[in-house]
Amino acid sequence: MIDFLGGWKRTHYCGALTAGDIGKEVVLMGWAHRRRDHGGLIFVDLRDREGLAQVVFDPDNSPAAHKKAEAIRNEYVVAIRGKVIPRPDGTVNANLKTGEVEVLVSECKMLNRSKALPFTLDDYVDVAENLRLKHRYLDLRRPVLQENLILRSKVAQITRQYLTGNGFLELETPFLTKSTPEGARDFLVPSRINRGEFYALPQSPQLFKQILMVSGFDRYFQVVRCFRDEDLRADRQPEFTQIDCEMSFIDREDIITVMEGLIARIFTETKGATVNLPIPRMTYAESIRRFGVDNPDLRFGLELVELSDIVKNAGFKVFADVVAGGGIVKGLNAKGCGGMSRKEIDDLTEFAKIYGAKGLAYVKMTAEGWQSPIAKFFTAEEISAMDKAFDAKEGDLLLFVADKPKVVNDSLGKLRNHLAKSLGLLDKDTFNFVWITDFPLLEWDEEEKRWAAVHHPFTAPMDEDLEYVESDPGRCRAKAYDLVLNGNEIGGGSIRIHQEKIQSLMFKMLGHSEEDARTKFGFLLDAMDYGAPPHGGIAFGLDRLIMLLTGSDSIRDVIAFPKTQKGACLMSEAPSAVDMKQLRELGLKTVVK
């Protein structure tokens, strides 16, 4: 028989009981995590979001409560009233927050039953992710996921407190907006009232937050949902959350200073970690030169080494010809990996090929010197110069790629991260931040044969590079900045264009006709004509930030109801077909291929 609450009020969370509560009468409510019979006594681990409490049913203390406890099974919903007592000698559980106490039950209510579970809720049990997502309401009861989401809530609270304390206003921007596709595809929402027309769900609040700056709200923020209809990867979701900020009458230094304070506050209050301020900075060019990527992981070395000048006249034609053709030769020193087998090196070669490398040359450093198929092609002077550049020692493994600069940097940069993971160099408890600055403003899209924005079309060029936007676009640097943590970009921002003339020029450089720019962005251009202030901002990816704070392997473990890599919610079975009546109201029909 299921009981009603009958006016009972919870006095404590299960996981909040301490030795200071001994002697108190308490009312606890939660789920039966585990039940054990011990010689007439029944022990139940009662669980809620704060943790576990051991409750004891003694037939001598309360026969009625003990009788009810006999029917309790895992995940039954239970309320108990009882007295907090110390655990007997030898039974204290130092691994449990409530491990010094237990509750001797005087009354019990069974508030609901549960079917047999499709999987156990212990954190250490490996369960197929699709099964977990299908029964997400059960999966979310697991302590590790509850801790992740509680921390997520805490980060959002810290963010609001910090930003409002620094003069920011929390303002909302629309979810039903105009489609202005740049990069990823928009999610489209058909309008019932305006047949044949569509809203788009925002990929970011970018345009509206800039218009808020034009409107005089000089410090804005929002913890906001964004949407992108793109092919999904392990760390991407079609809907995601940003901490979105914008400021007026500022420069890059103002934004970076305020945001460093936010990040430091978050890490201090959630991890007890000190973020040393100011956070180090590195230009985009330096990052590419040293690490091959614009989001370097600074927890380990394995820096890339430029070798083009050393090998440009070498007898090894593969290297020399690449340099002569405008390419580069780089390498990295996998310290202590000289004992790798040929198969292991072949696996590294195949990995590098994923990112465009045609091959991976290698040298094993032995007591006799270089051991490599390419050793015979180099002079003693060239070998000595490379040894010095690599700081090569006996037992090291030197790896080389020769190709176009982009291929070399991409493949070696990714290989660097791959090696670090396989060598156990990634400490999840170490947090290494770096600002990457001075990005290129534009990059040439070889497929589309046009210039594309490296960040987005609203990023301002460096003042000293403005004159080159039309004449030499590849030379222009942007007033852009990314915050990188352990190789993950957790925030990206820029100073924005605030003059209509420059914004129109940017659209022109991106291949928009004047008419097309007006159709898509006319409201922004119009706003700029009415006294737009200098402004800039940043957006932090909340999901990825929480993933790093919790040490989670998947972004899906820090989102309450995530989608699969196919964009599906297995629990609610979305997306789904809709009936013809709904389609007719929208003036739509489906086309079956």
From Swiss-Prot:
Keywords: Aminoacyl-tRNA synthetase, ATP-binding, Cytoplasm, Ligase, Nucleotide-binding, Protein biosynthesis. GO terms for molecular function: aspartate-tRNA ligase activity; aspartate-tRNA(Asn) ligase activity; ATP binding; nucleic acid binding. The keyword Transport does not apply. GO terms for biological process: aspartyl-tRNA aminoacylation. InterPro entries: Aa-tRNA-synt_II, aa-tRNA-synth_II, aa-tRNA-synth_II/BPL/LPL, Asp-tRNA-ligase_1, Asp-tRNA-ligase_1_N, Asp/Asn-tRNA-synth_IIb, AspRS_core, GAD-like_sf. One of its GO terms (cellular component) is cytoplasm. It is found in: Cytoplasm. Its main location: cytoplasm. Homodimer. This is Aspartate--tRNA(Asp/Asn) ligase. It comes from Geotalea uraniireducens (strain Rf4). The gene is aspS.
